[in-house]
Design a protein with these regions (language model features):
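Mature, Sec-exported extracytoplasmic domains of Gram-positive
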Residues: 1-176
Length: 176
């Protein structure tokens, strides 16, 4: 995780290495999208910008490139649905088209997106977790990179379903 906490995670928790692994596996793939933090959701289409989630997951799965390198500014909806379906249940091309009608080109089957998110760094840490069968719930919080202190009311819960093949699906994000 990024940031410069006043007290390193390894001094806060004996199991800091496991917490860092959980962060890297489940939080980091969607860290800069709108999927984490105070936004509550139970499906991909409830996340304000699924396009950003696609971009983050694409970059996570293809570390040396991004969608702009491959597609330019016209991203194929069918390939977006396939990528997002690796991490979320029930994703369809129709959902993406309906969500982004204003930038959808039916002739090419693409969404025209020129990028641009803005914003600054986002520092999260895993503060706990619970497993219940195939469900894993991560407790996490946003913290100040300057002080290492958690921001007030930043505690959240991210739930994923663990699959037998070692992959997972995001199920929801809620305030703690």
């Amino acid at each position: 995780p990024g940031g410069c906490p006043v007290i390193p995670d390894r001094l806060l928790w004996e199991d800091a290495d496991q917490r860092i692994q959980l962060y890297e596996r489940y939080l980091e793939p969607v860290l800069t999208s709108t999927a984490l933090g105070s936004i509550e959701w139970d499906s991909l289409m409830e996340i304000p910008r699924p396009l950003w989630v696609f971009e983050d997951l694409y970059c996570h799965d293809h570390p040396d490139t991004d969608p702009f390198d491959v597609y330019g500014t016209d991203w194929p909806v069918d390939e977006m649905a396939v990528q997002l379906s690796r991490y979320f249940d029930g994703v369809t091309e129709e959902q993406l088209i309906n969500k982004y009608q204003d930038i959808y080109d039916p002739a090419s089957g693409t969404l025209h997106y020129e990028g641009g998110r803005g914003g600054g760094p986002y520092y999260l840490r895993v503060t706990g977790w619970e497993e219940d069968g195939d469900r894993l719930t991560l407790h996490y919080e946003e913290y100040s990179a300057a002080t290492g202190e958690p921001y007030e009311d930043s505690a959240c819960l991210l739930t994923v379903r663990l699959l037998e093949d070692g992959s997972f699906r995001y199920l929801g994000n809620h305030k703690a």
